[in-house]
């Protein structure tokens, strides 16, 4: 159950980052204030809940094991950036993502 909490904390953290990115997207000047307030409010909510879940994780998992698992954030953000904003990702970046996943698998298998 705690590993599910860790994944959920990671996903909420990523959601918060993505909301911040969305807040920077161009909108008409008359809608800008509401747009920014909405997305930054959602970002704060996601990041706040992620922090609470992270504290639960740290109560149950050694920080040396738990913290590297947050590297999943790099993977989630890359996938979301491609899907949501059609951002280009170089082969070198994908290679880095593969190394991150490999590192997480290696570290996770020690538990």
Swiss-Prot record:
GO biological process, one term: lipopolysaccharide biosynthetic process
Cell location: Cell inner membrane
Pfam families xrefs: EamA (PF00892)
GO cellular component entries: plasma membrane
UniProt keyword Cell membrane, yes or no: yes
SS bonds (residue pairs): none
Domain of life: Bacteria
TM stretches of this protein: 38-58, 61-81, 88-108
Principal location: membrane
Bilayer topology term: Multi-pass membrane protein
Record bears the keyword Lipid metabolism: yes
GO molecular function: carbohydrate derivative transmembrane transporter activity
Stretches assigned to the EamA domain: 40-109
All ranges on the Cytoplasmic side of the membrane: 1-37, 82-87
Keywords: Cell inner membrane, Cell membrane, Lipid A biosynthesis, Lipid biosynthesis, Lipid metabolism, Lipopolysaccharide biosynthesis, Membrane, Transmembrane, Transmembrane helix, Transport
Annotated pathway: Bacterial outer membrane biogenesis; lipopolysaccharide biosynthesis
Residue ranges annotated as Periplasmic topological domain: 59-60, 109-111
Protein task: Translocates 4-amino-4-deoxy-L-arabinose-phosphoundecaprenol (alpha-L-Ara4N-phosphoundecaprenol) from the cytoplasmic to the periplasmic side of the inner membrane.
Subunit structure: Heterodimer of ArnE and ArnF.
Homology family: Belongs to the ArnE family.
The name this protein goes by in its record: Probable 4-amino-4-deoxy-L-arabinose-phosphoundecaprenol flippase subunit ArnE
Species for this entry: Escherichia coli (strain 55989 / EAEC)
């Amino acid at each position: 159950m705690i590993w599910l909490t860790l994944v959920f904390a990671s996903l909420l953290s990523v959601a918060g980052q993505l909301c911040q990115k969305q807040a920077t997207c161009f909108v008409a000047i008359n809608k800008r204030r509401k747009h920014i307030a909405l997305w930054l409010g959602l970002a704060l909510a996601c990041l706040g809940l992620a922090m609470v879940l992270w504290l639960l994780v740290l109560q149950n998992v050694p920080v040396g094991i738990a913290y590297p698992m947050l590297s999943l954030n790099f993977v989630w953000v890359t996938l979301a950036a491609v899907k949501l904003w059609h951002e280009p990702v170089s082969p070198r970046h994908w290679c880095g993502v593969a190394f991150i996943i490999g590192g997480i698998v290696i570290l996770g298998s020690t538990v």
